Amino acid sequence: MQTNSPIAGCDQSSLAIRGGKPVRETWLPYGHQVIEDDDIAAVTAALTSDFLTQGPRIQEFENAVADHVGVKYAVAIANGTAALHAAYEAAGISTGDEIITSPITFAATSNASLYLGAKPLYADVAPDTGLISAASVEKLLKENRAKGNKKIKAVVAVDYAGQPADYDTLQTLADQYEVSLIIDAAHSLGARYKERAGGFAGIMSTMSFHPVKTITTGEGGIILTNDEKLYDRLLAFRSHGIEKRKERLQKHDGPWYHEMQTLGFNYRMCDIQAALGTSQ
């Protein structure tokens, strides 16, 4: 068998992994953030402000991302995994349900469904892009429908290596089979899909701001949506299920009164992270 491998025919005992001399003296990271003076100034301003968390910089960052992508609502959150967890919960995914997603992704895309007692099913990917194959998704949906299986609640498409998935075709399939479309857009901030920003599609999309992503907040993520009901549910899930807005309280008992109306998590992003994200 012929091969074009650069190590074919060489003495593999000379490879560093087998005791040979390394070609580098220092570790080569798989990604690295870019931090400039304005980023440092933004973080310093946040550190010396009145709010380190739950302050105005959260909304500022959310608005900036929502405006860039072209959606109504954004919910900044602790990390990309938390973003997926929150999105799945808001979509009503729960015990016994199933999602269809891509095997070419970070584990969190699947794990977030397992957190809720659901099960991931895997569609194939296109060999030229690594993106989830709409034809494979359709095959899974059709096969499960023929079996009378109504457990599939969502298709979770993964934007991969800066490439948005085939949003239009996947949305058509989601509508046809009455499932939700959610976009894991961790790789597509700044990308374009038919003249629109990556991550605009589906009932929700999620992003990550880990240092290997397009912009970073250290750790951090965001959920984007045009649905006000989903937005409200995401806000509650992010912060212990707490409701502070006067018009949504069951009763009102002074300026510091709040209600824990549902079960939620502490998945909040802090103002220091948000300041860095807005600067980036």
What are these regions (language model features)?
Residues 105-110:
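Conserved coil-to-alpha-helix start sites within the AMP-binding
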Residues 75, 100, 121, 180-182, ...:
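Structural detector of well-ordered beta-strand residues that form the stable sheet scaffold
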Residues 51-98, 112-114, 122-124, 146-147, ...:
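Phosphate-binding glycine-rich loop
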Residues 1-52, 56, 259-261:
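N-terminal "arm"/small-domain region of PLP-dependent enzymes with the aminotransferase-like
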Residues 111-113, 173, 272:
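Hydrophobic/aromatic ligand-binding patch that stacks against planar heteroaromatic rings
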Residues 117:
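Structured binding elements
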Residues 128-217, 222-230:
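Active-site phosphate-binding strand-loop segment of PLP-dependent enzymes
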Residues 188-194, 201-280:
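Active-site region of PLP-dependent enzymes
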